[in-house]
A protein has these predicted regions:
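Hinge/lid segment of periplasmic solute-binding proteins
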Residues: 95-148, 171, 177, 197-204, ...
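Glycine-centered hinge/linker elements that transmit conformational signals in sensory
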Residues: 174-178, 218-252
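Extracytoplasmic/periplasmic substrate-binding proteins
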Residues: 38, 45, 52, 200, ...
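Short, well-ordered beta-strand elements
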Residues: 29-41, 62-67, 89-90, 138, ...
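Short, solvent-exposed loop/beta-turn-alpha elements that line the ligand-binding surface or hinge
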Residues: 109-123, 207-234, 284-287, 299-307, ...
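Conserved C-terminal helix/tail region of periplasmic/extracytoplasmic solute-binding proteins
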Residues: 63-64, 157, 340, 367-421
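Extracytoplasmic "Venus flytrap"/periplasmic binding protein-like
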Residues: 28, 51-123, 154-165, 262-266, ...
Length: 421
């Protein structure tokens, strides 16, 4: 498998902004496990997980040195750490990292340990498959969710409108902002959330960002297929129409998930496509999160329903000297006790769920879930973000952006030895 040579990226300035580690020295006779997480600081998942980490430390005699990052910052920092040969033991990750990190050779093969893990039967085949590449298990899941269209019901009731079911329903509300003093919805245009949202809108027209070919490699075929290019053009035009019709804030072109989730949780916007981790905001923002309902993501009238399915892996780094202890901590994260405490509404385990809307209403959308292909995605993700910017910031036409993205995806695949010729 192709091994990517990673050049060092200077991110030292980022580290100074991170949360201080939980622990800094090992207990007598124990190991120190370097853990990198990406939870929302101060939210329920962090609070419950800190308690569970302390319990694990007491039970094992090991110490966890935990540092928190955003996913984007973690991704950049792990590339630097891998290039320098100074990696942590265990990190949170996203599905987009599976192919990239595996191709780079920086994550451990957990297949043997996983097969011996007594709790593995609590995971469905689809979850295990999401942790697997080339028939090797390289991750332990800690969270699974799909995306849904969250709605502040009181806002829509006041506005006298029904929950939008289609793109056309959204675009018809061009007077919503003027009448209600807030925007109807929003989109992420930067960071990992932007490419995830774009993937869904493409899937609603039956499009893939890269399709498997007969030789086992991948290719974006839009520029070779007039119908596909026309559909991709419609997707980028949708972004522009949202701005032009004042459905979303003009400033959204510079926003990532941090701004969009915050805006919805605090009632600044009336609807948003996001995940059920926002259940945590019911306790931190009770005044604005009490009227939220869960709906399918609006789709084009000439398209089909789709959502993003995300099963997040924990990776043990190949360079770790504490793989056994890191595996024990990773499987502790995935244990029924820990999942019920910290991830009850979004657990990858089949025996952990709740009766809340955050669990059952999201799960009802899973049949329309789509995922990224198992290829190196860092270049593709950035190209997807850049393609949105070409429309919303650079003034390119929707067709120009779609055609450019098709070429950019194939260029990334070629760079990583994954392009079907």
């Amino acid at each position: 498998m192709f091994k990517k040579v990673v050049s060092a990226i200077m991110v030292a300035a980022m580290v100074g902004t991170m949360v201080a580690p939980v622990s800094v020295s090992a207990k007598d006779g124990g190991k120190t496990i370097e853990l990198w997480t990406c939870w929302t600081e101060g939210a329920d998942t962090e609070k419950a997980s800190q308690e569970m980490i302390q319990k694990w430390e007491e039970e094992t005699g090991n110490t966890v040195n935990q540092t928190n990052f955003t996913y984007d910052m973690l991704h950049e920092k792990i590339l630097t750490a891998a290039a320098g040969g100074n990696v942590p033991d265990l990190i949170w990750g996203l599905p987009e990292y599976v192919g990239e990190f595996y191709n780079m050779g920086i994550v451990a093969d957990l297949t043997d340990k996983f097969n011996e893990w007594e709790d593995k039967d609590a995971l469905s085949d689809s979850v295990v498959n999401a942790m697997t590449i080339d028939n090797k298990v390289i991750g332990i899941p800690y969270e699974m969710t799909v995306r849904a269209y969250l709605v502040h019901d009181d806002d829509l009731k006041t506005a006298g409108i029904e929950t939008p079911a289609t793109w056309e329903d959204l675009l018809a509300q061009s007077d919503y902002y003027d009448n209600n003093g807030k925007y109807l919805t929003e989109v992420a245009c930067t960071g990992v959330r932007a490419s995830q949202e774009l993937l869904v809108y493409l899937a609603q027209y039956g499009l893939e960002i890269a399709s498997a070919q007969d030789d086992g490699k991948y290719k974006n075929t839009w520029n070779e297929n007039k119908d596909e290019l026309e559909k991709a053009t419609k997707v980028f035009q949708f972004y522009q129409d949202l701005i032009d019709n004042k459905i979303i804030d003009f400033s959204a072109k510079n926003w990532g998930w941090e701004e969009t989730d915050e805006n919805f949780a605090t009632g600044i916007t009336s609807t948003y496509v996001t995940g059920n981790w926002l259940a945590e905001r019911e306790s931190s923002n009770p005044d604005t999160m009490g009227d939220v309902s869960v709906a399918p993501i609006p789709y084009p009238a000439d398209g089909q329903p789709a959502t993003y399915m995300e099963c997040k892996p924990m990776f043990i780094m190949e360079g770790s000297e504490n793989k056994d202890e890191a595996f024990d901590l990773a499987t502790a994260f995935c244990s029924k006790e820990w999942q019920e405490a910290a991830f009850a509404d979004r657990s990858p385990r089949s025996d952990v769920s709740t009766d809340s809307k955050w669990s059952k209403d999201f799960s009802a959308l899973a049949d329309t879930g789509v995922t990224f292909p198992p290829v190196t995605l860092s270049g593709i993700n950035q190209a997807m973000v850049d393609s949105i910017a070409k429309v919303l910031q650079e003034g390119k036409t929707a067709e120009e952006a779609a055609s450019w993205l098709s070429d950019a995806v194939n260029a990334s695949l070629q760079e990583n030895g994954e392009l079907s010729e």
